[in-house]
Each structure stands twice: as structure tokens, then as C-alpha cells.
Regions:
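Amphipathic alpha-helical interaction modules
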Residues: 20-63
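Short runs of predominantly hydrophobic/aromatic residues within well-ordered alpha helices
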Residues: 3-10, 28, 44-48, 63, ...
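Short terminal alpha-helical segments
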Residues: 1-35, 91, 95-97, 101
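Amphipathic alpha-helical binding modules
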Residues: 65-104
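Generic detector of bulky aromatic hydrophobic side chains
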Residues: 16-22, 50, 76, 86
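Charge-rich, solvent-exposed alpha-helical interaction surfaces
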Residues: 13, 31-35, 47-50, 54, ...
């Protein structure tokens, strides 16, 4: 099973939270608000859980393979400094949105 099939909910966020957000939104906060508000809290929780399954114990090579499978057309080195940095950026935004929802 390919990574995008194994961690399907997380994959959806890698498609949405890419390096091109700045082309469509004036700020990162505006992009995140627009991109994640349509997702149910349960989807965010699933994506965070899948993130940890995918990346917590992954080597740099494995992270690169997972990220490349999630979104092969993007080059995370240009915007994020590498695949692991993009993965961390996605996780940080998922967790921040969950926290925002929990605190109201």
C-alpha cells in the first residue's frame, strides 16, 4: 500500500497545505483558516494521528519517500528547506487548528 493510501486523511492535508499558499492568500493565517475550516475536527485528529504514524520514527530517506508520494509535483526544498521541514510545517498547522478549536 502506498503512503497516500495508508495515511489518506493526512495526504489530503499535504495536498491542501503546500508551498503555493502565498500565491492565493495574503497571509499564512488566512490560508490556513480557509484551507482547514471545512474539515471536521475528527479529520484533523485523524490527520495528526496519521502524521505521527508516518513520521515519528521515519528516517530522512523514508520521510522523503512519503512526502514525494503524497505530493510528487512539489519541491519542498525550495520553500521549506526539505521534506522533513514540510512535514513538520503541516503537523504544526494541524495541531494549531485543533488547539484553536478546543479553546474556542
Amino acid at each position: 500500500m502506498r503512503p497516500y493510501e495508508r495515511w489518506h486523511t493526512l495526504w489530503q492535508f499535504f495536498i491542501a497545505l503546500d508551498e503555493e499558499w502565498a500565491d492565493e492568500w495574503p497571509t499564512e493565517a488566512a490560508a490556513m483558516d480557509d484551507l482547514v475550516r471545512g474539515y471536521a475536527t475528527e479529520s484533523l485528529e485523524t490527520a495528526v494521528r496519521e502524521w505521527h504514524e508516518a513520521f515519528d520514527k521515519a528516517t530522512d530517506s523514508e520521510v522523503e519517500q512519503i512526502v514525494a508520494d503524497f505530493n510528487p509535483s512539489y519541491e519542498p526544498e525550495e520553500t521549506f528547506g526539505g521534506a522533513r521541514q514540510w512535514a513538520e510545517w503541516v503537523r504544526e498547522h494541524l495541531e494549531a487548528e485543533l488547539q484553536r478549536r478546543k479553546t474556542g
